[in-house]
């Protein structure tokens, strides 16, 4: 009996998880590598060790515009992995935003804390160079799902100048950054509803984490996202300076002094897709190399899911 084709996937966010699940279900051997401490990518969550509070400091909600992701959301909702929150048609994940990605990757070979630094390919297949540990295996196919500039650097490590013409589209993708600020506060902040969207100024939105489904009984805590413009202007500042500036902006917005019991800033350099690659995925059939992500279809979790699934279908057809 022939061994199943071996596929390496770089990135354990929604695009990588979607591609991994489709390929695994089609009978291929999938190995996922991610530099983070946990899966999820920008569907990120952080637990403060002192307070035990969870903060979704990346993507906040899931929405479905098309049938494929709507079907997946319905299945997750039936199993308690997501629940309606904030507005009609929007969902938060339970107990945190990594849950849908963890569900897609359940039972698969996943390596976190593994940074892929280079790629090589010969007649036998693909090899990965890792910063943390050696990886001796040869893979029949390779899927890249990091933000486009990071994927471009990996491809350049193999073919400087993007010698593979099918990946020139990576250069079309553009992103806006986002500074995220996680705050635990003595009491719930005085704004109506679960999400505050000022519409102008340094703050794009404030999300009431303690009101999300599955967080009942949690002490008051919020996640603040700075606006793309403010984040770009302060991109290289220290987290401490950003914390102080955004805390002052929030106090001015609410007309009160805020004394958090916990605060931590996180910078997302590639937060929001502002220009796409112009295709659902990028693929070189001869090399069996593909790229998927929200950079292909737009700034939504659904776009990452659809892109990963579409690339997986194409790759599965070739491998079969």
Region roles according to the model:
Residues 44-83:
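N-terminal FAD cofactor-binding segment of flavoenzymes
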Residues 61-68, 82-105, 236-245:
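Short beta-strand to alpha-helix junction loop
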Residues 112-126:
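A conserved short coil-to-beta-strand element within the FAD-binding core of flavoproteins
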Residues 182-234, 241, 245, 249-254:
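Active-site substrate-recognition segment that forms the wall
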Residues 251-287:
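Flavin (FAD/FMN) cofactor-binding core of flavoprotein oxidoreductases
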